[in-house]
UniProtKB/Swiss-Prot annotation:
It comes from the Eukaryota. DNA-dependent ATPase and 5'-3' DNA helicase required for the maintenance of both mitochondrial and nuclear genome stability. Efficiently unwinds G-quadruplex (G4) DNA structures and forked RNA-DNA hybrids. Resolves G4 structures, preventing replication pausing and double-strand breaks (DSBs) at G4 motifs. Involved in the maintenance of telomeric DNA. Inhibits telomere elongation, de novo telomere formation and telomere addition to DSBs via catalytic inhibition of telomerase. Reduces the processivity of telomerase by displacing active telomerase from DNA ends. The keyword Glycoprotein does not apply. Its cofactor is Mg(2+). This is ATP-dependent DNA helicase PIF1. Monomer. Interacts with telomerase. The gene is PIF1. It catalyses: Couples ATP hydrolysis with the unwinding of duplex DNA at the replication fork by translocating in the 5'-3' direction. This creates two antiparallel DNA single strands (ssDNA). The leading ssDNA polymer is the template for DNA polymerase III holoenzyme which synthesizes a continuous strand; ATP + H2O = ADP + phosphate + H(+). Residues 840-859 bind DNA. Residues 78-87, 120-132 have a biased composition (Basic and acidic residues).
Amino acid sequence: MLNANKSIIRLATYSIRNRIHHLRTLHSLNYINSRINIQDTNHIRPTCPCGSKQFMLESELDSALIEFLDNDDPFSDSEIKESDDLSKGQSHVYNGSPVTKNSILQIEKQQIQKSPRPTETNKRMQIRKDPDQNDNVDDDSLSSTFEFSDMDDDFMEALKAAEEITGNNTNCIKRTASTPLKKPIAKSMKNSSTPSKSAGKKYCKYIKTSSPSPSHYLIRESGSGVDILEGSPNKVQADNASPFRITSSFSSPSQIQNQGVGANPGPKSKAEQNVSSASQSSSPPMTVSQVRNPFKVPTQFRRNYSTRPITNQGSDTKKGNSHHTILLATQKPGVPFSNPSDRSYHKLEKTEGINEAQSEAKNVKPIILSNEQEYVLKQVLSGVSLFYTGSAGTGKSVLLRSIIKSLRDKYPKGVAVTASTGLAACNIGGITLHSFAGFGLGQGKVENLIKKIKRNKKAFTRWRETRVLIIDEISMVDGHLLNKLNEIAKNLRRNNRPFGGIQLVACGDFYQLPPVVKKTAHDGTELDDVEVFFAFESSAWKETIQRTITLKEIFRQKGDQRFINMLNNLRDGNVPDDTARDFCRLSRPLKCPEGIVPSELYATRYEVDMANSRKLNTIQGDVVVYNSVDTGILPEPQKTQVLTNFLAPQVLNLKVGAQVMCIKNFDDQLVNGTLGKVIDFVDRDTYMKSESKENPSTETSDEVSGLNDYIFNDFQKPKKVVKEDAPIAEQVLFTGQLSQKVEEESESSKRKSKLKDDLMKDYKNKKYPLVKFLLPDGITFRTVVVEPEQWTTEDEDGTVLVSRIQFPLILAWSLSIHKSQGQTLSKVVVDMKKIFENGQAYVALSRAVSRAGLQVLNFNRSKVASHRKVIEFYKNLSSHEKESRSGQQRLNFMQTSVKSVARAQI
């Protein structure tokens, strides 16, 4: 710390001392300048003031001045010492007399009275570069002008800023290394003959054209020179290299590459030059010599120091909004996708262990959470047990992924991620709530369930070590089950606090699908008029949930405000006349690209199966049947029930020309819900070899791995290099694990290897489907060889309770409303004829991105219904939020009033 403070003061003081040397010399130079006219680079023709006599100035004076100023470099050493030639007693000869400091001062005194006051024309000494002698110096480094006015004030301001930093913010100033500045190898300007690799102009693109106050500039030592940094006594940003940041105008690593800023800039192609010139037309970048810097040496005599950006800044994130998550392309309908031909200008920065082809294929773009999402995240991280809700498309799942990542960073162990259904659990990389509890279906009395859990050592340990329990799709969790979980947690953890001291984070929308009502008693008898019991009705909810937050901002239908209003009018079941008319107008057929038809949503699974079978039978050709491989340790009745929650079918029938849907997220464009068409069935190895033969000249080892990236294989060895700040969906893609664990060579790895062998035996003589997917922009297609994937329900130790291996495809002419919950569909047809459940109409209609991608058949407002308990719950919730906001406003007003009174008294 002390060395860093001394370094700043030492550099500032040393620069001032050398600046004084320059100023002392300038009076002599002014006298010489009044007699000298530099007309070309080869001959110097001095002239007497009277203009009557010309003579050649001796070369000794020329070399003495240049050598003196060249050695007098404020950055040549990190120590304050007399290192120049004159301070060592060395002298130069001028007209037969040695030139020393004293002689220069004497010349100065003699000419002060004789020399006229410098004018604007003679304030600058022009020196032109000899191209034969100075090939290793940039044109911009040898500026044609030397401004010495106002420099003393700049130095004093810089020194004052350094003193304020050392006095007030000593804790913020850190040096990662004590490496002193290395003195660059001095090369004589006359003896330099080696051409420089960096000839031509170097633009400081990272330096703002509107330069801030000189007092905000500081310098940083580096192995290759001095970096110009921008700092402030009141705002200092710490990074791995320096407590200050480089003044920059870029915002992301990709933009850095687009602007051509790098450690080793090379020659640009014509296309790149055109792009660069177009981006610079509005405000031309400043050259190195044009940047005002209070510590700079006169540019015509200084060495070519490097001023380069800090390359270890991985991303540009705003302070306080560092929690990244992903925004799928289906939620950005208005954003055009980049043209593949433009990839040469938009290459991502390479990361260790991730090749460039993979980076382009796995283009998962991070976003910043909204203010309300950020507020929820902060409440969760502070330990508050809460429930957050919102209408369809408000980013509940996006926020949940960010919450999971942040909690796992805070608690490496003890974060249980669960959901009410297997499908919802797969979407967030978790397990079902029943699997977490370890009591099977959860039927029976609490005492018996506790005994069952205690016999299961893993389940018992899981209950004892859990710190945070996350439940997604809480709307489908029965209230009686939540009460049982609360009692079990208190008993197993021997803690009478709510949920035994476990923090509870619940997410969902009760206006969507309700819990499944059990219409049979424990003895098997049929029950009539069984009313649903929601989670918010349970005593566990009232005891545990401390805060409820409603998300207001909608992302899925963003840009179609009328459609947002139409969907909001459906939530409580009271459909206005104008909203009903708007939905009736959506009965027109949709326009889709050739070969793709909209997916139809039906209320029952029977309708879905019949519609898909009819469509498949109309296609000529042979049917290719893929049977799933199902395993697990659960007994058969429970295993079968859990498998029904998986979106992957037990039997998948495909033909060439069949419309399918991808049911896994692979990047921000090829996501769960992307429609495609089977164009062929190919052998995987043969297809890869044929692709390699088509492009033999351009294929490299990196491109081979990039091609593997387009082939979805959950059984490839998990990649151990994962970006630290990667979103959850991106980590799942890299590791191939839904549970997001990079497994070592353990029993779990051996188990998965055995599953792979079993799968390959079943698919031994079968080919893989080649699918042409329509990306969410509605224009771009991507052709992919699809390989089998694995869906598992596991406990925290990795033991597979239930597993299914199947291709991540389903026939997509028709889907059930139940399985469409949580998905985003670009083209969808909703037939409301057989809708029977509360919330079904709202779930089905809200899957669409916009009205342009939605067709509604048989719209009937009587089919739109919401449960009265849910309506009452949200009504009370809304009034409670209003009271909280008004109370907070009153509190803020009181605090402001108290502060005003205190100021008045002072």
